[in-house]
Regions:
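Active-site rim/loop-helix segments in enzyme catalytic domains that contact anionic ligands
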Residues: 1-113, 117-118, 122, 149-156
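Hydrophobic, aromatic-enriched interface-forming segments
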Residues: 112-120, 125-153, 158-164
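Aromatic-acidic/polar surface patches that form glycan- and anion
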Residues: 6, 10, 61, 109, ...
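Hydrophobic positions within alpha-helical membrane elements
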Residues: 14-16, 144, 167
Length: 252
């Protein structure tokens, strides 16, 4: 089966699902990550500060594209692909500051809707994995809601991943449950926690997850890579996703 993952920005799917995607590939599935809002000026750990303001979008967009490519090469299989929709991220699209992108309702222009829906249609996937929307980032909520509106039917296999680092720690438990309850109503199916991989050597899982996170070193520092990698300890070296009945029935 082909599984398509919606990643609002480059790195979101990698941080949350690096181990799961590896497990799906090892089980023989094809995986496509659709990176949506990829035109950006946000790369705090790059040299963007030395670039003229008129060139920052092209500079950052190119840097982050190389990071997606690094992850794809690390996976080492033709069954793993990454599709770039080249949409502007929220600060560029909505003309707001970086601190103003949270807690906003989904805001999707006709272009955004058309590109995301078209990508999902062209993927011809048998299952989708979408962000929960933890933290309320408008790009995450928008990508998720547009994808949900494009579902082929209520029984279509769909699952939701917990974004990182938003989903880390006890403080995240309540937002996770709130998102699950809300999305249960949206998909008209009970969402239950599932894991793509079986229990494995936890230290090995942490190391694998950290290697994936480090592909995106313009976005995060060493402390963040550790935080993201260590998150899988909570689930015995795995990543939790929330799946509808269609997903569970497909045995994914």
């Amino acid at each position: 089966m082909k599984i398509t993952v919606i990643s609002p920005h480059r790195g979101d799917a990698a941080f949350a699902l690096g181990l799961s995607i590896r497990a799906w590939l090892e089980e023989g599935h094809a995986v496509e990550v659709v990176s949506c809002f990829t035109r950006s000026e946000f790369a705090p750990y790059s040299d963007v500060g030395s670039v003229h303001k008129n060139d920052r979008v092209s500079f950052v967009t190119a840097v982050r594209k190389r990071e997606d490519e690094a992850w794809r090469k690390q996976a080492g299989t033709a069954k793993f692909t990454i599709t770039d929709l080249n949409l502007k991220d929220a600060p560029l699209r909505l003309h707001v500051g970086a601190s103003e992108v949270f807690g906003r309702a989904a805001e999707a222009s006709e272009k955004v809707v058309a590109k995301i829906k078209r990508a999902l249609e062209m993927s011809k996937a048998g299952a989708w994995v979408l962000p929960l929307g933890l933290g309320g980032h408008v790009d995450h909520v928008t990508a998720r809601d547009v994808a949900l509106s494009a579902r082929p039917g209520e029984g279509f296999p769909v699952a939701f991943y917990e974004e990182l680092p938003e989903g880390i720690g006890v403080a995240a438990d309540e937002p996770v449950q709130a998102a699950v309850v809300s999305l249960t109503l949206a998909v008209q199916s009970k969402l239950e926690p599932v894991f793509a991989a079986g229990v494995e050597d936890v230290e090995g899982a942490v190391a694998k997850k950290r290697r994936v996170a480090w592909c995106y070193d313009s976005q995060i520092d060493e402390a963040a890579t550790l935080e993201i990698a260590e998150a899988c300890r909570k689930f015995e070296g795995r990543e939790r996703i929330w799946a509808n009945e269609g997903w569970r029935g497909a045995g994914l």
